[in-house]
Each structure stands twice: as structure tokens, then as C-alpha cells.
Swiss-Prot record:
Peptide chain release factor 1 directs the termination of translation in response to the peptide chain termination codons UAG and UAA. The gene is prfA. GO terms for cellular component: cytoplasm. Belongs to the prokaryotic/mitochondrial release factor family. One of its GO terms (molecular function) is translation release factor activity, codon specific. This is Peptide chain release factor 1. Keywords: Cytoplasm, Methylation, Protein biosynthesis.
Length: 357
């Protein structure tokens, strides 16, 4: 493991020198690739440096203990040694987690589909709440997001369905844990008796696919156009700019109405279709893989209830790992980093255990 870590450190230093080269930015594609590779190694190198520092401090403390005669000082140094030994074990565990092979699709951008489930109008409003939560989280991460398609509900501000595109660094690796059924318990504004209602919305996070990832035959597609209800300016409800694509072999249907031109909507809809087909392809590959590790946090079962948002008790519970937070208002404003980090650590621990078996 330590030979590998030293090689990573040397690679990190080499990449840093390449990025500092005044001519590096002349080739933007190469520069972006180098910068991404450099960022991906930073966390490993920083953890390795902390580990190496603790090892050095341990050696110095042991030497000090060997030469120290005063009992009080020896006891103090022994306490320091015990503390450093615990720290080294913890940092070694962290390094093992960081060295686990990454899912190759973790760096992809994503398409997030949010659909209102059981609960009628309240479910549609909750779907809108989840949209805002993810938009605020994307802003905090420095990601970009856009609405690709939506279907508003009869209640103002609600969505029966909405599709977001999110782009940035390590988006799928972060957001993949959000797929599943999210449940809300609260008193609706229209509830006169003060009774708590339970509603739900489903979330599907799909890695964005490149054209080379999936083969789509033109003959397999059916294109329909219709009048847009989106931001089409004077074209809204006058020109058929919205596009619906049906992939006939799979039955998958995608639609986009957000852009002003039919061509732009078609391009976006094709991006959504590629993501859906790629997601299905990945799921099939996982099922066929021998000895597939069944993870609690990334089961791929989007019908599984993963989280409950209890408004009366200001509590959010993730049922996959038993994570509980009483900071519901902050979470609904996009502060979901602690939940995602807990899920990520649990997933990594499962993977590490599988590696050791």
C-alpha cells in the first residue's frame, strides 16, 4: 500500500509542475484533464502527509521516552504515544478507503428525475421542495443546474414531475445516494383539523451518457412535437417547439420543452434518453457481475423508501444507515452534505470489508 501511496505522491507533484507551466493553458482540453487528475489525487496526498507526520511524531516520542528518566515526564510521553498510535490506525484506515477503486461513472454529470408519488397535491408540493433542496445544494457545491423538463400540478408551486440536469465535479459520485423514495410527514396548509399527512416523491439520479456509451438506432425512435408550456417567449402555445422521443424497443419516453427551439429541445431530450439507456445498461451489467456486492446505500431499487422528513419533530431519518438529524429546516435549504458524507462512508466501509473477505 505504501509503495502505491508514494507513487501517487510523486504523480501529484509531477502534475502540479505541469499545471504551473505557463504554456499549460494553451491546450484547454489537456489542461482540464490534468487539473481533474490533480484534484482527484489531492485528498489522498493530504491524508498520506498527515499519516507520515503522525509516524514521524511517534518515532520522536519513542526516542524521547527511551532517554527520559523523570517518571512524570515518562507518563506524559507514554500518553502521547498511545494517542499517536490510535491516530495512525485511524489514518491508515482512511488511506485504505481513499485507495478503493472509484466507480468510473462517479465523475459524470447527472440527470435527476423527481416525481410526485402518493399524497396528491401535498406530494406535488414536496416534489417541489426536493427540487429546491437539490438546487441549493448544487449552488453550495459550485455546480451548475438547469431544468430540462417539467409537468406542473394543479396546485400552484407543485410538480407532478420535473427533470434537472446537474453538471460539475464528481456530481454522480455525490448524488447517486439520493435515488429512491423520499417520504414527508407534515400538516398541509389546507388541513383544517391539524392532522399530519404522509406523502412521498421518488428520485432517480442517472449518470449522463456520452454518445459512445450507448448505441441508439434512428429507426428505433419516434419523434413527436407539441406546443410548449416552457420559456418560449412569443412561441409558447403557438409553435410546436416541445419534443417527445419514444425509444420503441425499451418503451422509454423522454420529453423536453424548456428551450425556445425544437432543435434545442430535441438535443436535450436525446441527452435524457442516452442517460436512461445508459443507466439501464449499467444496472444489467451489475446484475450479471459475479458475486455482486449488495450495498445498503446504493441498491439501485428506486422503489425502496430511503428517507423520511418529519416536520412536526424537525427530524430527517435516512433508513438505510439509521442516520438521524434534527436540522430539517437547514436540510430543506440544501444542507445535505452531512447525510451524503455518512452514506458515502458507510458505502466505503462495505466496499473495504468486501475487499478484505
Amino acid at each position: 500500500m505504501f509503495d502505491k501511496l508514494q507513487a501517487i505522491k510523486e504523480k501529484h507533484e509531477d502534475l502540479e509542475q505541469q499545471l504551473l507551466d505557463p504554456h499549460a493553458a494553451e491546450d484547454q482540453n489537456r489542461f482540464r484533464k490534468l487539473n481533474k487528475e490533480y484534484r482527484d489525487l489531492c485528498s489522498i496526498v493530504e491524508a498520506y502527509d498527515r499519516y507520515a507526520l503522525a509516524k514521524k511524531q511517534l518515532e520522536e516520542s519513542r526516542l524521547l521516552l527511551k532517554n527520559e528518566k523523570e517518571q512524570d515526564m515518562r507518563a506524559m510521553v507514554q500518553d502521547e504515544i498511545s494517542s499517536l498510535q490510535e491516530s495512525i490506525l485511524e489514518r491508515e484506515k482512511q488511506l485504505k478507503l481513499l485507495l478503493l477503486p472509484k466507480d468510473e461513472v462517479d465523475s459524470r454529470n447527472v440527470i435527476i428525475e423527481i416525481r410526485a408519488g402518493t399524497g396528491g397535491e401535498e406530494a406535488a408540493l414536496f416534489a417541489a421542495d426536493l427540487v429546491r433542496m437539490y438546487q441549493r445544494f448544487a449552488e453550495q457545491q459550485g455546480w451548475k443546474y438547469e431544468v430540462l423538463d417539467f409537468n406542473e400540478s394543479s396546485v400552484p408551486g407543485g410538480f407532478r414531475e420535473i427533470v434537472l440536469g446537474v453538471s460539475g465535479h464528481d456530481v454522480y459520485g455525490t448524488m447517486k445516494y439520493e435515488s429512491g423514495v423520499h417520504r414527508v410527514q407534515r400538516v398541509p396548509d389546507t388541513e383544517t383539523q391539524g392532522r399530519i399527512h404522509t406523502s412521498a416523491a421518488s428520485v432517480a439520479v442517472l449518470p449522463e451518457a456520452e454518445e459512445v456509451d450507448v448505441e441508439i438506432r434512428k429507426d428505433d425512435l419516434r419523434f413527436d412535437t407539441y406546443r410548449s408550456g416552457g420559456k418560449g417567449g412569443q412561441n409558447v402555445n403557438k409553435v410546436e417547439t416541445a419534443v417527445r422521443i419514444t425509444h420503441q424497443p425499451s418503451g422509454i419516453v423522454v420529453a423536453c420543452q424548456e428551450e425556445r427551439s425544437q432543435l434545442q429541445n430535441k438535443e436535450r431530450a436525446m441527452k435524457m434518453l442516452r442517460a436512461k439507456l445508459y443507466d439501464r445498461q449499467l444496472a444489467e451489467q451489475q446484475e450479471k457481475r459475479a458475486g455482486l456486492r449488495r450495498s445498503m446505500v446504493t441498491t439501485g431499487d428506486r422503489s425502496a423508501k430511503i428517507r423520511t422528513y418529519n416536520y412536526p419533530q424537525s427530524r430527517v431519518t435516512d433508513h438505510r444507515i439509521g442516520f438521524t438529524s434534527h436540522a430539517l429546516p437547514q436540510i430543506m435549504q440544501g444542507d445535505i452534505k452531512d447525510i451524503i458524507e455518512a452514506l458515502k462512508m458507510h458505502d466505503q466501509a462495505e466496499r473495504l470489508q468486501a475487499e478484505l473477505v
